[in-house]
Amino acid sequence: MEMQASRQLAVTQQQAWDALNDPEVLKVCIPGCDKVEATGENQYAIGMALKIGPVSAKFKGNIELSDIQAPASYKLSFEGQGGPAGHGKGSAAVVLTPNAAGCELGYTVQASVGGKIAQLGQRLIDGAAKAMAEDFFKRFDLEMQKQHPASYAARDAAAAAAGAEAPAESGGGGVPIWAWGVGAVVLAAVIWLSR
């Protein structure tokens, strides 16, 4: 499975980078996540529960960051086990590009799954991954609004002055990656699939 998308954020590149590398922020934002902890330099353990169709399981996995170009980009590799429910592994590239409205978070994820999850079919898996990614970004956006209310107020004021609504978020797409880049987006879906 491969997913690629981008998302406009109202925060600066550095603010987004800091949040995507904060285990506590990720734990709040990744659906079903109950554990994100550092196990070494640029290495993390994650725990999460998820349900895809009729398959429910508790997943444990690991993520390792590489090619780190703070605060602009990094790559991450992940693998996870969910017992008989399945397993997954993959990688993601996350890029934060500054712009006048804040920054754009772009990501590309490649992932493979096995076990009962793989038997559900690609359409169901892809749909669940995209839904998890969307949920991650909604949570991440809310967390950024809590941490940086002035950035969002400025965005909303600029949109009102222009007589338009606040900029719509672009793309969607998944990735379970409890890690960075939301990583956010991709991370959540990747983690979900890899567990």
What are these regions (language model features)?
Residues K116-R155:
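A conserved amphipathic terminal alpha-helix motif
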Residues M1-A45, K51, W180-R195:
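Hydrophobic ligand-binding cavity/cleft-lining segments
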Residues D67, E79-G127:
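Beta-strand/loop substructures that line and gate deep hydrophobic ligand-binding cavities in soluble
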Residues A16-L20, L26, L65, Y107, ...:
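Hydrophobic pocket/interface hotspot
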